Amino acid sequence: IVHPQAKLDATVQVGPYAVIDRRVEIGAHCKIGPHVYLTGVTPIGANNRFHAGCVIGDAPQDLKYQDEPTRLRIGDQNVFREHVTVHRSNKLAEATLVGSHNFFMAGSHVAHNCHVGNHAILANGATLGGHATVQDRAFISGNCLVHQFCRVGTLAIMQGGSAISKDLPPFTVARGD
């Protein structure tokens, strides 16, 4: 189901039972899998792939949110595997930002107002709390948790099952115990 006001490039492929709301804009050569829900004020760049069950641009999970048309911006050549969720910002003056060439594995979550750089990887079940930042080429392993307002630096690695509640500097490794 594609809303008549949604803007899709002519090369976009849309799978069965996908829902694309009116304020979504999708760039060239994107592939939208079955049962994907794209909503909110969400401009999406070129060559992105959304696998089955993704929910992209839905309202933030924040009690302060007042049903405003907040934003999520997605760059080019990202992969969103099965059941990935990415929420839009909780304030009109800000946006949730996803750069380019990122890989979001199944079940990963990007909360409101997060900034994800370029070439980052979030493995299965990785979760970013609100306002978190993931810099370029960071690797967040399976079932890792990044607390709200924390930053994961460039080329930093979080090993499987780790959680951080403080910034992880660039070029470092966090290990869960």
Can you say where each PLM-predicted feature lies in the sequence?
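Structural signal for interior beta-strand "rungs" in well-ordered beta-sheet cores
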Residues: 1-174
